[in-house]
A protein has these predicted regions:
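Conserved alpha/beta-hydrolase catalytic His-Asp/Glu region
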Residues: 133-139, 151-208
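Short beta-strand/loop motif that positions the catalytic acidic residue
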Residues: 210, 216-218
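Gly/Ala-rich beta-loop-alpha elbow adjacent to hydrolase catalytic centers
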Residues: 100, 104, 108
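Catalytic active-site module of serine/aspartate enzymes centered on a nucleophile-bearing elbow/loop
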Residues: 240-272
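Acidic catalytic loop of the alpha/beta-hydrolase fold
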Residues: 221-225
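Conserved acidic catalytic loop of the alpha/beta-hydrolase fold
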Residues: 78-96
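Conserved HGGG/HGGXW glycine-rich cap/lid loop of the alpha/beta-hydrolase fold
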Residues: 9-73
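Flexible "cap/lid" loop of the alpha/beta hydrolase fold
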Residues: 109, 113-114, 119-152
Length: 272
């Protein structure tokens, strides 16, 4: 289980590479998970993607096997961006194709606006620009205060609300059990801290500043980001492309992996 220290944080990561062993010039794809998840959640993408690319998966700070910054840590977009840049620097990677899901996409937009020279392309999947009132309702399961609900339920209890609200996929009982167990591993103070950070975040002003080739994987029925919001993202990023994915909820990369992977791979092959 490889780890590397960047920006004063020990980060766990995985590299999957099933390309032909004699190839010397290999592009790297970075798959970044969302809140409460870990690098494990991309398991079903690896067979299709790692045959042609080196695939990098990183546990975000406080998630999976990466270090927990503790309950007094002040979460900020800037520090998470510094984590990302430090991670690339520590691995000696100059440029990657970046795909971020949900908050991973939010961070991807901000990273691309700040350090475009580090990305060959940007793909954002099911990513809002900001947490709207309707999204807050879905995240809390009603009109309840999210912080109190998280403190009361913990990650494992919260995930049940998210499945009911179609924020998280619940494909079958075995999948629900696995997802619940994985979410339970994320400390409650991490979930609360990130949600406080996102409550006031809005990356809309950064969209026109993104100058790297961009694909928007847009869910048609996400309770966290409407299709009209996804269109705004596509229209605000210069020359961005969009693929609308008809799924039951927010997690299209889980519910419709074949369609998402197909659109993603087609996008990469179109790049110069």
């Amino acid at each position: 289980m490889p780890t590397i220290t960047a920006n004063n944080c020990e980060m766990h990561y995985e590299i999957d590479d099933y390309t032909d062993p004699w190839l010397k010039d290999k592009d790297t794809i970075w798959l970044q998970h969302g809140v409460g998840r870990s690098s494990k959640f991309w398991y079903h993408w690896i067979p299709a993607v790692a045959r042609n690319y080196r695939v990098l998966r990183r546990d975000m700070r406080g998630h999976g096997l990466s270090a927990d910054p503790g309950p007094n840590y002040t979460w900020s977009i800037d520090e998470l961006l510094n984590d990302m840049r430090g991670f690339l620097d520590a691995l000696g990677l100059d440029r990657v194709h970046y795909l971020g899901e949900s908050i991973g996409g939010i961070l991807g937009v901000a990273f691309a606006a700040k350090w475009p020279e580090r990305l060959k392309s940007l793909t954002i999947c099911s990513s809002p620009t900001a947490i709207r009132p309707s999204a807050r309702t879905a995240l809390s399961g009603g009109d309840r205060e999210l912080g109190r609900e998280l403190e009361r339920l913990g990650g494992g209890g919260w995930v049940k609300i998210l499945i009911e609200q179609k924020v998280i996929s619940g494909k079958n009982p075995a999948h629900v059990e696995w997802v619940t167990n994985e979410w339970s591993k994320t400390p409650t103070h991490v979930l609360r801290g990130i949600n406080r950070m996102l409550a006031n975040a809005d990356i809309s002003p950064l969209l026109p500043q993104v100058k790297v080739p961009t694909l928007v994987l847009a869910p048609s029925r996400s309770p966290l980001t409407s299709l009209s919001d996804q269109l705004i993202i596509r229209n605000s990023i210069p020359n961005a492309r969009m693929a609308v994915v008809e799924g039951p909820g927010h997690e299209i990369y889980v519910d419709e992996p074949e369609e998402c992977i197909s659109a993603f791979m087609k996008f990469l092959k179109m790049l110069p």
